C-alpha cells in the first residue's frame, strides 16, 4: 500500500497514562506497577508530529483515530496543537479521540471543542460510586466536568460504558445522564476479558473486576491459585507451534484481501 492510498490513521501520541486499569496490558497482574517495557518518554511533541506527518502527507487523510494502547491522549501536553495540525492539514478529516477524560482544565476542553470535525469518546464506566473501581486513579466528577465544558462549547462527545458485574445495574441511569448532559451517543459494551483481582501498591487484592453476570462474552475467572497457569497455558502445548515464529501447517494464513488495514486503507503510527 502506497502512502497516497492511505485514508485512515490510528495514532498513539503518548505512552503516558494517568489511569491504572486492572485489565490493561500496561499493568501486569492487575497491579499498580507498569510493565518494564513501557517507555514513558515516548510522547510525541508537535515538532515531531509536523516532521513525521507534514501537512502534505495529511491532506488526503479522511479519518484519524487517536487511541492509546498503553497511554492516553490527554497526558500529552502538545495534544491540542497536534489535533489542530491534523485539522489544518485536512479540514474535512474526521477525528475521533478515545480518552478517560480525567485530566486537564475545563478551559483546555473548551479549546479542544473549537476544532471542527472532532468527536471525543469519554470512557465512563458507571456512576461516581462504581466508575473508579475499574478506571482506577481517575475521578468521575472531573470527567463529567470536563465533558460538560467540552459539550457546552459545541464539542461532540460520546459516552462509552464498559459493563462489569459491579456496574451492570447502572446502565440505564448512565444512559439517562448522558442524554441530560448532551452527549451525542451512549455506548454500552460487554468485555471479553476474564475476571481479575485489582491489587494495591502492596500487592494486596482490594476488589475483583468481573464481567457482567449476563455477559455473552464471559471467558471464566482467574483465581489467585490458577493465575500463573492461565497466563502460560499456550506453553503447555508446544505441539501447536513451530520454531522461529513460523505458523503451524494446519493453521491457514489469511489472504491479503482479508487484511483490515489494506481493505480500510489504514495504518497505525
Tell where the protein language model's regions lie, with residue ranges.
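Short cysteine clusters
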Residues: 17, 21-24, 259
Amino acid at each position: 500500500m502506497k502512502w497516497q492510498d492511505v485514508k485512515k490513521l490510528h495514532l498513539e501520541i503518548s505512552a503516558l497514562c494517568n489511569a491504572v486499569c486492572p485489565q490493561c496490558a500496561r499493568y501486569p497482574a492487575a497491579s499498580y506497577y507498569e510493565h518494564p517495557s513501557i517507555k514513558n518518554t515516548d510522547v510525541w511533541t508537535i515538532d515531531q508530529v509536523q516532521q513525521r506527518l507534514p501537512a502534505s502527507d495529511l491532506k488526503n487523510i479522511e479519518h484519524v483515530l487517536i487511541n492509546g494502547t498503553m497511554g492516553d491522549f490527554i497526558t500529552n501536553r502538545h495534544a491540542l496543537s497536534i489535533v489542530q495540525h491534523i485539522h489544518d492539514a485536512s479540514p474535512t478529516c474526521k477525528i475521533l479521540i478515545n480518552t478517560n477524560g480525567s485530566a486537564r482544565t475545563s478551559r483546555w476542553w473548551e479549546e479542544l471543542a473549537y476544532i471542527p470535525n472532532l468527536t471525543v469518546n469519554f470512557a465512563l464506566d458507571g456512576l461516581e460510586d462504581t466508575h473508579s473501581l475499574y478506571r482506577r486513579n481517575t475521578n468521575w466528577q472531573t470527567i463529567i466536568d470536563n465533558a460538560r465544558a467540552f459539550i457546552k462549547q459545541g464539542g461532540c462527545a460520546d459516552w462509552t460504558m464498559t459493563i462489569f458485574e459491579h456496574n451492570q445495574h447502572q446502565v440505564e441511569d448512565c444512559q439517562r445522564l448522558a442524554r441530560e448532559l448532551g452527549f451525542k451517543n451512549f455506548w454500552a459494551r460487554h468485555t471479553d476479558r476474564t475476571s481479575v483481582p485489582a491489587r494495591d501498591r502492596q500487592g494486596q487484592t482490594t476488589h475483583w473486576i468481573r464481567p457482567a453476570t449476563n455477559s455473552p462474552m464471559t471467558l471464566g475467572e482467574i483465581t489467585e491459585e490458577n493465575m500463573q497457569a492461565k497466563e502460560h497455558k499456550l506453553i503447555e502445548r508446544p505441539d501447536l507451534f513451530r520454531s522461529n515464529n513460523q505458523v503451524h501447517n494446519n493453521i491457514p494464513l489469511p489472504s491479503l484481501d482479508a487484511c483490515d488495514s489494506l481493505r480500510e486503507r489504514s495504518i497505525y503510527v
